[in-house]
Amino acid sequence: IAQGTSELTGGITNLNEANKAQSNYKFVASKGASTSANQAELNVDGTMHYQGHKHGDNYVLDNTFSNFNLKVEGSKLELYADVHYRKYVDNNTAGEWQDAKQIKVSEWTLKQPLALKAGDVAFASNGQGKFGSQDVISALGDFYKDDVHTGAITGKVKVSRECPPVPSTSAKPSSE
């Protein structure tokens, strides 16, 4: 963010700290769950705080993303987060604070559908993703609208055990 700062906490780090214009973030999930072999939800503790366009004592752009949830189902991967941000007014005015819960930040299509099995399972997007909602664009002051701001994603999860098979829903006829 122009004329700004960034701060990361918890399970979030920038693997390219020397060149923040080309940031490459690493998210380490604190917990995860799955209900089937092609579905998972991973939760990341930590925050991403960005400030930019400082005027006086305040920043025109000031937002904190937190409570990250990465949801995968089949070939669809979506990143959700809470965001606390200043509503954009203009380049010289710090707007009122706004809050939005679990907005879709970004979305990607995976190269292959998720297939969980016991052990390490890797996944990768089929190229860059895109912003997931108007909410995230608003939180960024409507400055960053195009998809180049959501890079490709890769990841690995450690699955502790096989997912049980989906229970059968067919019922046997009763003898009554």
Q: What is each residue range found by the language model?
A:
Residues 1-32, 41-43, 49-166:
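Extracytosolic secretory-pathway proteins
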Residues 162-176:
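Ser/Thr/Gly/Pro-rich low-complexity, disordered linker/stalk segments of secreted
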